[in-house]
Amino acid sequence: MPFVKIDLFEGRSQEQKNELAREVTEVVSRIAKAPKENIHVFINDMPEGTYYPQGELKKK
């Protein structure tokens, strides 16, 4: 049962996230030979000011 977690800065529309989830599901199903009904995609909208690579605030 594949679980796919995607972290994105917030700002994408619901339509964009829906399309992303559908496309990711298709690819995972094809490559991992997993039934689509067993694939779970989680999209996390990260607010600006919450990402610190190498300890430094990263902005969009």
From Swiss-Prot:
Record-listed E.C. numbers: 5.3.2.-
One Pfam family matching this protein: Tautomerase
Isomerase found in the keyword field: yes
Domain of life: Bacteria
Enzyme's top EC category: isomerase
GO MF annotation list: isomerase activity
UniProtKB keywords: Isomerase
Active site location: P2
InterPro entries: 4-OT-like_dom, Tautomerase/MIF_sf
Gene3D superfamilies: Macrophage Migration Inhibitory Factor
Entry's family note: Belongs to the 4-oxalocrotonate tautomerase family.
Name of the protein in question: Probable tautomerase SAG1079
Species the sequence originates in: Streptococcus agalactiae serotype V (strain ATCC BAA-611 / 2603 V/R)
Taxonomy of the source species: Bacteria, Bacillati, Bacillota, Bacilli, Lactobacillales
